[in-house]
Amino acid sequence: MKVIDLNCDMGESFGHYKIGCDEEVINYISSANIACGFHAGDPQVMDYTVKLARDNKVGVGAHPGFNDLQGFGRRKIHMTGEEIVNELIYQIGAIRSFCEANGVGLSHVKPHGALNNMASVDENLARAVAKAIKLTDPNLIYIALAGSKMEQIGREEGLKVAKEAFADRQYNPDGTLVSRQEAGAVLHDKETIIERVVQMASEGVVTAKDGTKLNINPDTICVHGDNPEAVELAASIRHMLQEHGITVKSLGTWFTG
């Protein structure tokens, strides 16, 4: 039986600002990556989102990013390895405390935005992220872009690394994600996205923008839930996976690394 995890970034509202359709998308995913207050989120949102995941039996993960609320963590910030380690320990610790307060276990860590993109190709950054996870809790699952420096370094550090693919993002031939600043970086056609996800989950393959077939064999696939159309898309993705005999389950219930 083929098993896959569907993850989604959540808890990215802040104060009076409402971002995402968390309450709707939660019905179709198996893991929630919850913002930790640096690129998005605040204590009230973090607590609410942990409860939302718990009540819907969805796995909870930390989604740490650069300290950049205005840029939503999508702008590059150059920091020392020590600074990265400490900022991630701080953020992971925050969401883990909310998990403990609500009787939930923290299952994984997935870096956000620019930090995720930079660490995917920068060995020193990737090692800093892995070190922060290892120092916080070496049993946490490290969600890393399939084929990236994060995956490589995470394994070298002895962490449980779950390979990630993105449902609605275009890929470069080297396996990195096409920059959001480029046209066509984010896919919008529903049928195309669903077809790609099924191919990822069943065959372990994704087609890059030049037609290259990339062997990624993902353990988890990221779906986005930041607009009403995304809710319908997430529902369709889950339904189609099940139609192809693929079971959707949170990483913490089956993944061993």
UniProtKB/Swiss-Prot annotation:
GO terms for molecular function: 5-oxoprolinase (ATP-hydrolyzing) activity; ATP binding. Coiled coil: none annotated. One of its GO terms (biological process) is carbohydrate metabolic process. The keyword Glycosyltransferase does not apply. It catalyses: 5-oxo-L-proline + ATP + 2 H2O = L-glutamate + ADP + phosphate + H(+). Its EC number is 3.5.2.9. Keywords: ATP-binding, Hydrolase, Nucleotide-binding. Pfam families: LamB_YcsF. Disulfide bonds: none annotated. It comes from the Bacteria. NCBIfam families: PRK05406.1-3 (NF003814), PRK05406.1-5 (NF003816). Catalyzes the cleavage of 5-oxoproline to form L-glutamate coupled to the hydrolysis of ATP to ADP and inorganic phosphate. Forms a complex composed of PxpA, PxpB and PxpC. Belongs to the LamB/PxpA family. This is 5-oxoprolinase subunit A. It comes from Natranaerobius thermophilus (strain ATCC BAA-1301 / DSM 18059 / JW/NM-WN-LF). The gene is pxpA.
